[in-house]
Curated annotation (Swiss-Prot):
Catalytic activity line of the entry: adenosine(9) in tRNA + S-adenosyl-L-methionine = N(1)-methyladenosine(9) in tRNA + S-adenosyl-L-homocysteine + H(+); guanosine(9) in tRNA + S-adenosyl-L-methionine = N(1)-methylguanosine(9) in tRNA + S-adenosyl-L-homocysteine + H(+)
Source species taxonomy: Archaea, Methanobacteriati, Methanobacteriota, Thermococci, Thermococcales
Subcellular location: Cytoplasm
Key words, A-Z: Cytoplasm, Methyltransferase, S-adenosyl-L-methionine, Transferase, tRNA processing
Domain of life: Archaea
Top EC class for this record: transferase
Intrachain S-S bonds: none
Organism (species): Thermococcus kodakarensis (strain ATCC BAA-918 / JCM 12380 / KOD1)
Domain SAM-dependent MTase TRM10-type: 87-292
Protein name: tRNA (guanine(9)-/adenine(9)-N1)-methyltransferase
E.C. numbers: 2.1.1.218, 2.1.1.221
A GO molecular function held by the record: tRNA (adenine(9)-N1)-methyltransferase activity
Length: 370
């Protein structure tokens, strides 16, 4: 799927432009200059002009720095001084029909003030993610009441807000089928789902208490209004545990899969925080534990090398690994030491579970022979 930068690049090529600069050296610093310039043009802040002298700073169409350019982005007020080459109207006409990413605030009043603040923050961060790929106006917030508008400190004029139900917003935009991101769904999100014109990615934080399993209810309400709903979940190696639950991070996973072509596991890893990784680590480590019994006391032991294995697909640091070990009362030993323990122990079933019982006399003899 094309990004706004791709569309802008093609528009410049059509005009025979191979590089573009800015009249000010203080233009926003970022990794993707074409995207940032295109955003400002789409929102009517400026245009591309032909200038009589080369600009001090410029980039080619791949974003690489070049010596200068006779084409520059500048505010629209410069129309009287320079010849416009690419205007906001021209660029908007070339924009593809990108899907909406909807945050449904129907359950807004079930949240505490602190949780409402979290929602506003995540909406703002979601806009920041979308403007890295598209224009940002693809982010739609439905059931956007006055309280939300007052609490939201982001660019309200650059996102799409709708005061009514999601179903009405969809119908007004000619959309009759959506993908609902639901951790309780049976099917996993895939490339086949990227043909829809709207994704509903949340609107709920802290899914405990009176908000438990409210996401499926959003789907039921849409279906009752005649909207076809594809319920999909995001998983990491087949399990939802370890998948970020913040609205903006779910959106980031979708964008990395849809636009960058990354696999789901890759996208989840890139958007994961150590907190989410520890959730999954708590589930994985006990599966790899071996029970050793010494003089009636049981120790659950895992290989220390598991850290290297799990860190390939979980965003964990060594301190996260140690923290989970302590929480689960596990002991980590080097693999060679575990092999040694297996030599001096016998396997026995105790209370229906496999234990390795270490015989101290045998251990002493082996150590003596060493």
């Amino acid at each position: 799927m094309k990004t706004l930068a791709d569309v802008f690049r093609e528009a410049l090529k059509e005009k025979g432009i191979s590089s573009i600069g800015t009249l000010s050296k203080r233009f926003r610093k970022s990794k993707n200059k074409l995207q940032d310039i295109a955003i400002e043009i789409v929102h009517g802040k400026g245009a591309v002009f032909r200038v009589p002298e080369k600009t001090a700073v410029a980039w080619d169409l791949n974003g690489n720095r070049v010596d200068g350019s006779y084409y520059a982005y500048a505010p629209l007020c410069m129309r009287e001084k320079f010849e416009p080459v690419l205007t906001p109207e021209e660029l908007r006409e070339k924009l593809p029909d990108w899907p909406y990413f909807i945050i449904d605030l129907y359950h807004w009043d079930k949240h505490t003030q602190k949780e409402k603040g979290k929602i506003c923050l995540q909406v703002n961060q979601s806009y920041g993610l979308l403007r890295d790929y598209f224009t940002g106006s693809e982010l739609a917030v439905t059931w956007a009441n006055e309280e939300f508008r007052e609490m939201f400190h982001g660019p309200l004029d650059r996102i799409t807000t709708y005061g009514g139900p999601t179903s009405e917003f969809l119908k007004e935009n000619g959309i009759n089928e959506v993908v609902l991101l639901d951790p309780w769904a049976e099917e996993v999100l895939s490339e086949k789902d990227f043909d829809v014109k709207a994704f509903i990615i949340g609107g709920i934080v802290d899914t405990g208490g009176n908000k438990k399993k409210t996401t499926p209810k959003i789907g039921e309400e849409l279906e009752s209004a005649g909207i076809k709903v594809r319920r999909r979940k995001i998983v990491l190696r087949g399990d939802v545990v370890g998948v970020p639950d913040r609205i903006n991070r779910i959106l980031g996973i979708i964008l990395k899969m849809m636009v960058e072509g990354k696999s789901m596991d890759e996208a989840v890893y890139e958007m994961q925080e150590p907190l989410h990784a520890r959730w999954r680590l708590r589930k994985e480590l006990p599966k790899r534990a071996t029970r050793y019994m010494v003089e009636g006391k049981v120790y659950r032991v895992v290989e220390k090398e598991l850290f290297d294995e799990y860190s390939k697909w979980l965003k964990i640091r060594w301190e996260d690994f140690v923290k989970v070990l302590r929480e689960l009362d596990l002991v980590a030993l080097e693999r060679k030491r575990i092999h040694h323990l297996n030599k001096i122990s016998n396997a026995r079933i105790i209370n229906g579970k496999l234990h390795r019982v270490i015989l101290l006399k045998r251990a002493a003899m082996l150590c003596y022979n060493c």
